[in-house]
């Protein structure tokens, strides 16, 4: 049995320091690999609802504006 999966290209804007932290935490050098690993973890982890990324991004943006 062959399972067909539709693949889409997704894009986002991240502060540079968040991307660097993501690469460090995932152990990946390439942006696309770090994001893919993070998305996979997010979908599998039962604790992801506790610290939403949107809230962290808002805090980073507020700090940069100061």
Swiss-Prot record:
Name of the molecule in the record: Uncharacterized protein AF_1718
Organism: Archaeoglobus fulgidus (strain ATCC 49558 / DSM 4304 / JCM 9628 / NBRC 100126 / VC-16)
